[in-house]
Amino acid sequence: MAKNKNAVINRTLHTVADLHVREAGEGEPQRRTITGYAILFNTPSAPLYDYRDEMAVEIIAPAAITREFLDGCDIKMTMFHDRQLILARSKNGAGTLKYDVDEKGVSFEFDAPNTVDGDKALELVRRGDISG
């Protein structure tokens, strides 16, 4: 059976680093901004495959992802990797999910929505239960 060389492959990244809530200063209203890194360059991922003596990890090179590439994508920040629990989104570079590409990787920032899921995300990040 021949493989379709034009097939689209969807990838889901499950590693987040430096995740935190940007706290408000004294006298400022409480903030709902969550920031972190979705991708760290030149850093081994969690094992994608680990069986017996064989293990595979992924290392993403800085040249693999550009701002221009991301600006053409539909990117969703989800709760627990559940595509129904969307916290923020960037569609073709516009939306509630902000991101940047720097020497460390791909950083992100979004204001958690005023929903049950947004409140849950804020609390879990503040407590350190979700930390990357």
Residue spans for each PLM region:
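Signature of dsDNA virion morphogenesis modules
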Residues: 1-132
